A protein has these predicted regions:
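Conserved small/polar residues in nucleotide/adenosyl-binding loops
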Residues: 230-232
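N-terminal lobe/hinge region of extracytoplasmic solute-binding protein
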Residues: 28-77, 108, 183-187
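Surface-exposed binding/hinge segments that line
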Residues: 75, 119-169, 196
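Bacterial N-terminal signal peptides that target proteins for export
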Residues: 1-9
């Protein structure tokens, strides 16, 4: 049950999940993720799927408080400047290390092109890596809800994205299909091993995850979207 609380309840838990204590969990919800590109669509099912694979600088817990995720700490050096300490020892599911430059790349990607999440962080005027694995974010004025906004911005591997032609977010509204709209590779607790749009998505445990694997006993999650509920 710890897994359900940590990974689903804080994020619009509208699905039906069973059995709770099995190594394989079958998960149903009304509708499917529209895309696997974590910046291409800002809507519930897409975020639900992305959160199993991708992570943010900060996250929300069951009581909706902000907690560290890929950033271990943060501070404001002035009302318009935030400095985030990036967590050491984190690797993407392909084994490559998370770097401050991946965070910079991801935030800039989320701010540009056809990204559907740019409105969430449009107060950001610049983002850069500094020293000691830190990232500095500047805003166009004091922004007391920046942490809440950043909790919805997922961090991608810069190298993986560029290798696969995904430097820019998928243009979902133009029906564009990219490698990153049908594949995913993040730092989260699961990896996607099968993707059948609107039919079935299979997630398997990411053994390289930096978090506490004892928080859940799941080896696999099978998402079976209930498309008929959309029309009720």
């Amino acid at each position: 049950m710890k897994f359900l609380i940590k990974f689903f309840l804080p994020f619009l838990m509208i699905g039906i999940m069973s059995p709770a204590f099995s190594a394989t969990l079958k998960w149903s919800m009304p509708g499917d993720s529209l895309t696997l590109d974590p910046h291409a669509q800002n809507e519930g099912p897409t975020h639900m799927v992305s959160r199993q694979v991708y992570e943010s600088l900060v996250t929300r817990t069951v009581d909706m408080s902000i907690q560290p995720q890929l950033a271990t700490s943060w501070t404001t050096t002035d009302p318009e400047t935030w400095v985030f300490q990036i967590r050491d020892g984190v690797v993407f599911s392909d084994g490559s290390p998370l770097k401050a430059s991946d965070v910079v790349f991801s935030i800039n990607r989320a701010l540009s092109g056809a990204s559907d999440v740019k409105e969430l962080i449009d107060s950001i005027t610049s983002v850069k890596s500094t020293f000691n694995n830190q990232v500095e974010i500047k805003t166009d004025g004091p922004n007391p809800i920046l942490l809440n906004q950043l909790s919805q911005i997922f961090i991608m591997s810069e190298a993986w994205s560029k290798k696969n032609g995904c430097e820019q977010s998928q243009d979902y509204d133009a029906s564009q299909e990219t490698y990153c709209s049908i594949n995913a590779m993040g730092t989260g607790p699961f990896v996607i091993t099968l993707r059948e749009q609107n039919t079935r998505t299979v997630f398997e445990r990411n053994n390289s995850w930096w978090g506490d694997q004892s928080q859940h006993n799941l080896d696999k999650i099978e998402l079976l979207p209930i498309l008929s509920l959309i029309h009720i």
